[in-house]
Amino acid sequence: MMELRCWGSDWGLPSVHPECLVVLAYARFAGAPLKVTPVDYTWASPKGTVPFLTSAGEDTHQPANILNFFRKQKYNADYVLSAKEGSDTLAYIALLEEKLLPAVLHTFWVDTENYCNVTRPWYASHTPFPLNYYLPGKMSRDALDRILVTRGQPPLYSLSEVEAQIYKDAKECLNLFSNRLGTAQYFFGSTPTSLDAFVFGFLAPLYKAHLHKVNLQQHLKQLSNLCHFCDHILSAYFVSDDAGTSAAGQEAIDANLQKLTQLVNKESNLIEKMDDNLRRSPQNRPQKLSTLKPVGGAENSHSSDLLSH
């Protein structure tokens, strides 16, 4: 049995982490049997990174390597692709990593409002002590280093210039993928492939997170077909997950709970009215009982018993 260690669920997603989502989605598309173990207070990773896959004593890291491992085990979501579609898939994934991922990393890990109010609290609460004081800050620094290494070259010298450029590129990338998807359900044919897994993994946290700085998120939400794409994958492949409940499912639960509460209140009111009617009924008036006086120290004994409880 293959075991995948990944960051846990929230925001209606099976994982809040883009690369973990890529692996989870591809595994569902390919039908790979996985035991999913969220990072918790017993977390230990050989290289300190997630996602990582363990199978027969062999550890595999990084989404691309994990997906290749699945393919070697005959779990291949790309078997329907032609040679041209396969090469297009590689080009599109490279475009996502070059043009979209830096802005996603910046949104969650570098932007001060989102990092302090959303990202750091979430990851710190899901990381074992004392690593929870160190790991979120390290992940933030790693994200910034990754952005600067890939995009901080001349003529972009200052961080503000880099930020402006990566968000411009990300919006253009989102527009391109929106146009490429069009009205289709998936990017290639009627079944999802690795490209769908990467697009879903990178977009879903941006789409679903409760961000404070929503610049890129607002642009994504204006591209309704990409939002529907994420919603469809969640409902088609993750609806039965115990890890989380979709927004629509939560609304249904809340509505049923409200109806049940109203029904219970109605029944309680009815019972109270019946009880009042019974009290007012002549044949059910309680008989006046004579006052019983305690014998000896019984009263004091009873009081002591009550106090002892």
UniProtKB/Swiss-Prot annotation:
Its main location: mitochondrion. CDD domains: GST_C_Metaxin1_3, GST_N_Metaxin1_like. One of its GO terms (cellular component) is cytoplasm. Residues 274-309 are annotated as: Disordered. Residues 280-290, 300-309 have a biased composition (Polar residues). Keywords: Membrane, Mitochondrion, Mitochondrion outer membrane, Protein transport, Transport. It is found in: Mitochondrion; Mitochondrion outer membrane. It holds the Pfam family GST_C_6. The keyword Metal-binding does not apply. The keyword Ribosomal protein does not apply. GO terms for biological process: mitochondrion organization; protein transport. Belongs to the metaxin family. Part of a large protein complex spanning both mitochondrial membranes termed the mitochondrial intermembrane space bridging (MIB) complex. This is Metaxin-3. It comes from Xenopus laevis (African clawed frog).
